């Protein structure tokens, strides 16, 4: 492993989804988008639902949907413990669009029944948008 890389492991409750040497990653933290480069300061933080962008050697990129979880950065090792982690090819675009549409419909009909309901609906929208973004990025990356 060179000075310009580090080892990344992405695991979910179901399985290990990625393990290997990378140049950098980009993920959505609780404070917003963050990049992790070699030599990053040690860190432990929560991550929000979104797309994990992995840049491997020779600038090859891979994208994974993360539904939230924990990011741990150590000296030469980064670990993501995800609630759910899904590769783009495992997603169903039609189902993701339907989920987004249903959540948007619920939010339009929201009548202050409960703050928890509102939080769940907005979370569902965020997850559906992230899945659709992942599929879009993967398609775009194939044609480059």
Swiss-Prot record:
Keyword Nucleotide-binding annotated: no
Keywords assigned by UniProt, alphabetized: ATP synthesis, Cell inner membrane, Cell membrane, CF(1), Hydrogen ion transport, Ion transport, Membrane, Transport
Coiled coil ranges: none
A Gene Ontology molecular function term of the record: ATP binding
One Gene Ontology term, aspect cellular component: proton-transporting ATP synthase complex
Cited InterPro entries: ATP_F1_dsu/esu_C_sf, ATP_synth_F1_dsu/esu, ATP_synth_F1_dsu/esu_N, ATP_synth_F1_esu_C, ATPsynth_dsu/esu_N
UniProt membrane topology term: Peripheral membrane protein
Main localisation: membrane
Ion transport is among the record's keywords: yes
Localisation per UniProt entry: Cell inner membrane
Listed CDD domains: F1-ATPase_delta (cd12152)
Subunit structure: F-type ATPases have 2 components, CF(1) - the catalytic core - and CF(0) - the membrane proton channel. CF(1) has five subunits: alpha(3), beta(3), gamma(1), delta(1), epsilon(1). CF(0) has three main subunits: a, b and c.
HAMAP family: ATP_synth_epsil_bac
UniProt family annotation: Belongs to the ATPase epsilon chain family.
NCBIfam families listed in its UniProt record: ATP_synt_epsi, PRK00571.1-4
Protein task: Produces ATP from ADP in the presence of a proton gradient across the membrane.
Name of the protein in question: ATP synthase epsilon chain
Gene name of this polypeptide: atpC
